[in-house]
């Protein structure tokens, strides 16, 4: 079984979000699992530099101009690169300029990605062609459409990492992207009078996956579907929509081997975690106090992530004797709010604006509770890292958060399945009640340790997801 992942970023070469983590981990595990998985990416500068053994496969003139297809390897995974400097050789973000304006030629840049994904199934590399083209998010959403236009030379899977990003472009671009105008149709890639790369993937793929079972259900409902609920309900009825939970890359995220921690530990040596907490308190300017529960946030600061609720609930958290360490960037209003809280409560609130991968490991190793109060969360990786590190996740019941964290209720404690704290409603009162439950459990150290061990014993390795995808590929074949 030969599978080509078509996508726009890959950790650690280039990362703007969780998609990169998935592509950085899943193909390698699939190879271990017996699937010949390769990855197709645009040759953005950071990616091009990271693939040091890239060789020319072929050169082509395309609707987007001349391209060179390169092939190399990264961490044992075969990587195809679309080398088109006039489209991809730009500094900074792959999607927008330094003023945060989307590149005006994004329609061409990402149509080309989908087109090359299809052409790979038509023999662009004469020595390797995929049985399945697995496209990820809107950037690769045209790949299933091009495959449909070419008579479906391979099966296609389209994975939704976040339905909120739809890849919308004016209709007149149909003349430029080498797809028949007949595809610009309500039964096709047209959405609200525009081309939607996302809808293209949803409509033309043989199967759609979402990155958690709960999110797969949620996106059939109007409040989560952004207007796509009719199509997604139809795909659900046809058995062509399912959820496959993302995993954790245990080579990178494991407290037993994590060299970024001051003190490494396992579920049997959890007392070693205390040194990480002490170092984190020092680094964040917090009072060094092993008796104060340390709550943490590692997140983009946006309304979607529910960080406004944390600001609202913060006085209640601090009154009970808790501390907060925050690492993140985003909404200027939220940034100012957290910086003001840090100034008002020195020793209790520490804030770092920005994102540093290495420091996120130190927070995960040192905190007691990781807050993920998202309004919606397709899968979420932060809570999975928390479980892995014995840093109990406090989450809202939505998407992948609902699939991965069990509340420390009395019955769940009795059944041995408690792994964190879960609240229902997207408001500060509901969040504060969950924070209160965390304080109650914290006051019972042996129970807290029991839940930590339970959380750390859960299996969210990529091997589970790889098995699900392999079964799906063979079903399609």
From Swiss-Prot:
Keyword Glycosyltransferase belongs to the record: yes
GO biological process: glycogen biosynthetic process
Residues annotated as binding ADP-alpha-D-glucose: 15
GO molecular function: alpha-1,4-glucan glucosyltransferase (ADP-glucose donor) activity; alpha-1,4-glucan glucosyltransferase (UDP-glucose donor) activity
EC number from the UniProt entry: 2.4.1.21
UniProt keywords, alphabetically: Glycogen biosynthesis, Glycosyltransferase, Transferase
Known pathway: Glycan biosynthesis; glycogen biosynthesis
A cellular-component GO term for this protein: cytosol
A Pfam family reported for this protein in Swiss-Prot or TrEMBL: Glyco_transf_5
Catalysed reaction, written as an equation: [(1->4)-alpha-D-glucosyl](n) + ADP-alpha-D-glucose = [(1->4)-alpha-D-glucosyl](n+1) + ADP + H(+)
Similarity comment: Belongs to the glycosyltransferase 1 family. Bacterial/plant glycogen synthase subfamily.
Role this protein plays: Synthesizes alpha-1,4-glucan chains using ADP-glucose.
Name this polypeptide is given: Glycogen synthase
Lineage: Bacteria, Pseudomonadati, Pseudomonadota, Gammaproteobacteria, Enterobacterales
